[in-house]
Amino acid sequence: MAKLNQVTLSKIGKNGDQTLTLTPRGVNPTNGVASLSEAGAVPALEKRVTVSVAQPSRNRKNFKVQIKLQNPTACTRDACDPSVTRSAFADVTLSFTSYSTDEERALIRTELAALLADPLIVDAIDNLNPAY
């Protein structure tokens, strides 16, 4: 089990020149969802990441790893009060059988990272262009 620690994401953004530091906010004791967010004065404007690992159950035979990202955008014109004008979300769900190996899980993780860096996926996300 990994300890919930501060996470720093570097080389992010369109030009790869941004850094984001996420601070642990705790683990929900009911559902085991770990929460991290950008330290900010207004909670609604914080960038958030949640991570959870669900164990197999009677109805579901696989482990389910869920990662969610939320990036709110704040109003910055005309000295408005802090408010969220829009948000971008990402929701990634990975599913593994209890028999999967750490090698297989690492392969999926690294394939996903490489896929997100591929020009086809970059164009789809950044420019909202569908594949043809």
Swiss-Prot record:
> Pfam family of this protein, just one?
Levi_coat
Cite the Gene3D superfamilies for this sequence: MS2 Viral Coat Protein
Which Gene Ontology BP annotations are present? Answer: regulation of translation
Q: Which GO terms describe its molecular function?
A: RNA binding; structural molecule activity
Q: Which domain of life is it from?
A: Viruses
Q: Does the keyword RNA-binding apply?
A: yes
Keyword vocabulary terms for this entry: Capsid protein, RNA-binding, T=3 icosahedral capsid protein, Translation regulation, Virion
Cellular localization per UniProt: Virion
Q: Which GO terms describe its cellular component?
A: T=3 icosahedral viral capsid
Chief localisation class: virion
Q: Which InterPro entries match?
A: Levivir_coat, Phage_RNA-type_capsid
Q: How does it assemble?
A: Homodimer. The capsid protein dimer binds to the viral RNA via an operator hairpin, but also many other RNA sequences in the viral genome.
Similarity remark = Belongs to the Leviviricetes capsid protein family.
Q: What does this protein do?
A: Capsid protein self-assembles to form an icosahedral capsid with a T=3 symmetry, about 26 nm in diameter, and consisting of 89 capsid proteins dimers (178 capsid proteins). Involved in viral genome encapsidation through the interaction between a capsid protein dimer and the multiple packaging signals present in the RNA genome. Binding of the capsid proteins to the viral RNA induces a conformational change required for efficient T=3 shell formation. The capsid also contains 1 copy of the A2 maturation protein. Acts as a translational repressor of viral replicase synthesis late in infection. This latter function is the result of capsid protein interaction with an RNA hairpin which contains the replicase ribosome-binding site.
Record-given protein name: Capsid protein
